[in-house]
C-alpha cells in the first residue's frame, strides 16, 4: 500500500520536472528538457525580443546589425540575418536556436534539426505577435516573469498609441525600403501595420 502511494505521488509530481514547451510561429511544438542557457538568435528583431524576455545574458551568438540594446553588440556574430555560418552556430553549442523563417529561409530548419539542435521559428506578422514571441522566449529561457511584464508593457503602449490616433483621417504613406530597384511593402508586412497604428495608410497595402 505504501509503495503504491509512493508511485502515485511520483506520477503526479512528474509534470513539475518537465521542461518548457511552446508553439512557434510555424506551428511547431518546441520542447526543451530544461530552460535554455545558450541561445543563438539569427535576426536582429529576435535578439531584441530575447533581451526583452530577460534572456539577453543567455545569448551566445547573434547576427550583424544586432545593435539593440547596446549589450547585444558584444555578443559573437555568426553572419548576417540572410547568410549565417552553420559551422559557427554549431561551434557555440547552443541549446536553443531562434530562426527567422523568411530571413534565414525555412530550408535551414531540417539541417539544424538533423544536427540535434532545438529550433524555434520566429515569424511575427503583426504587432500582437511581438508580445507573444517575448512571452515564448521567456518560457523557453526560464525568465517568464520578466518576459510577461515587458510583453504586457508593450501591449499597453500599443493600445495607448492606438487610442491617441483614434478616428483621425489617415495620411497616405509610401514607405521605400530600397531604391534600385524601387521597393516597398504591401499590407501584410509588419511595416504596414505600424504605419496604420500611427495613423497612416500604406498606398500599396492592397498589392500582392
Please name every model-derived segment.
Residues 55, 74, 115-116, 198:
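Short, structured coil segments at secondary-structure junctions
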Residues 19-22, 28-29, 96, 100, ...:
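Extracytoplasmic substrate-binding proteins
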Residues 86-87, 109, 192:
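Short hydrophobic/charged patches on amphipathic alpha-helices used for structural packing
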Residues 63, 188-208:
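His/Asp/Glu-enriched short active-site or ligand-binding loop at hydrolase and phosphoryl-transfer sites
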Residues 1-8:
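Sec-dependent signal peptide recognition
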Residues 30-32, 47-52, 67-71, 181-186, ...:
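Short, solvent-exposed loop/turn elements at domain surfaces
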Residues 37-103, 203:
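A short, structured surface patch at a secondary-structure boundary
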Residues 13-15:
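N-terminal signal peptide c-region/cleavage motif recognized by signal peptidases
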Amino acid at each position: 500500500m505504501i509503495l503504491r502511494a509512493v508511485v502515485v505521488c511520483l506520477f503526479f509530481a512528474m509534470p513539475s520536472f518537465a521542461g518548457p514547451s511552446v508553439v512557434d510561429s510555424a506551428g511547431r511544438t518546441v520542447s526543451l528538457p530544461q530552460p535554455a542557457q545558450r541561445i543563438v538568435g539569427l535576426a536582429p528583431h529576435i535578439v531584441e525580443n530575447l533581451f526583452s524576455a530577460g534572456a539577453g545574458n543567455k545569448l551566445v551568438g547573434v547576427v550583424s546589425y544586432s545593435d539593440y540594446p547596446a549589450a547585444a553588440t558584444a555578443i559573437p556574430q555568426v553572419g548576417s540575418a540572410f547568410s549565417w555560418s552553420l559551422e559557427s552556430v554549431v561551434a557555440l553549442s547552443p541549446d536553443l536556436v531562434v530562426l527567422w523563417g523568411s530571413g534565414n529561409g525555412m530550408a535551414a530548419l531540417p539541417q539544424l534539426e538533423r544536427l540535434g539542435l532545438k529550433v524555434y521559428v520566429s515569424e511575427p506578422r503583426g504587432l500582437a505577435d511581438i508580445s507573444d514571441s517575448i512571452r515564448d522566449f521567456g518560457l523557453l529561457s526560464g525568465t517568464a516573469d520578466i518576459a510577461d511584464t515587458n510583453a504586457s508593457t508593450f501591449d499597453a503602449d500599443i493600445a495607448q498609441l492606438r487610442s491617441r490616433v483614434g478616428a483621425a483621417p489617415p495620411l497616405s504613406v509610401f514607405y521605400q525600403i530600397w531604391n534600385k530597384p524601387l521597393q516597398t511593402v504591401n499590407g501584410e508586412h509588419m511595416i504596414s501595420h505600424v504605419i496604420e497604428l500611427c495613423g497612416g495608410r500604406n498606398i500599396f497595402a492592397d498589392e500582392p
